[in-house]
Amino acid sequence: MAENFSFDVVSDFDRQELVNALDQVKREISQRYDLKGTETILELEKENIFITTNSELTLNSVIDIIRQKAIKRKLSLKIFEYKSIEAVSGNKVKQTITLKKGLNQEIAKKISKNLRDEIKKINVSINGETLRVMSKSKNDLQLAIKLLENLEETYKIPLQANNYR
């Protein structure tokens, strides 16, 4: 049994689910009594969500709705990185939410080191924004997946195990 088993570790999210969640947020903003007439604008660009509204209270309500809809769509809340609130013209406030996607080299190296320190019989290689974890034992790979769940909390990034072979 010289066959190696492997899986890939990625930090990703389903963009279409995010688009659907934000569409639901826009619909709820237009229908909720406390948010009607607040001139709230919600924009999604490649790696950012921009929220512009008339008060911080409304902004906090919109952020809560975004979180609720993201959870219902099975999106991790760790993909959202909240920037500071800015005052913009016309007595409005704006917040930028950056979307985290991909593993940078520094975090990939730390995760790789943690996995190798805990489980001696695995090989970990970094391929761009993906980690490939290989072992001759499926049990070691399952232990690595369990360890990834703990590392997700440590590094505050969403991690998924894909292509389990």
Curated annotation (Swiss-Prot):
Question: What's the stated role of this polypeptide?
Answer: Nucleotide-binding protein.
Residue ranges that the Swiss-Prot or TrEMBL entry lists as coiled coil:
none
Q: Which Gene3D superfamilies match?
A: 3.30.70.860, YajQ-like, domain 2
Source taxon at top rank:
Bacteria
Q: Name one GO molecular function term.
A: nucleotide binding
Pfam families according to UniProt: DUF520
Report the family membership. Answer: Belongs to the YajQ family.
GO cellular component: a single term? cytosol
Q: Which UniProt keywords apply?
A: Nucleotide-binding
Specify the protein name: Nucleotide-binding protein P9515_05441
List the cysteine pairs that form cystine. none
What InterPro entries has UniProt attached to this entry? DUF520, UPF0234-like_C, UPF0234_N, YajQ-like_sf
Instruction: Quote the CDD domains the UniProt record gives.
Output: YajQ_like (cd11740)
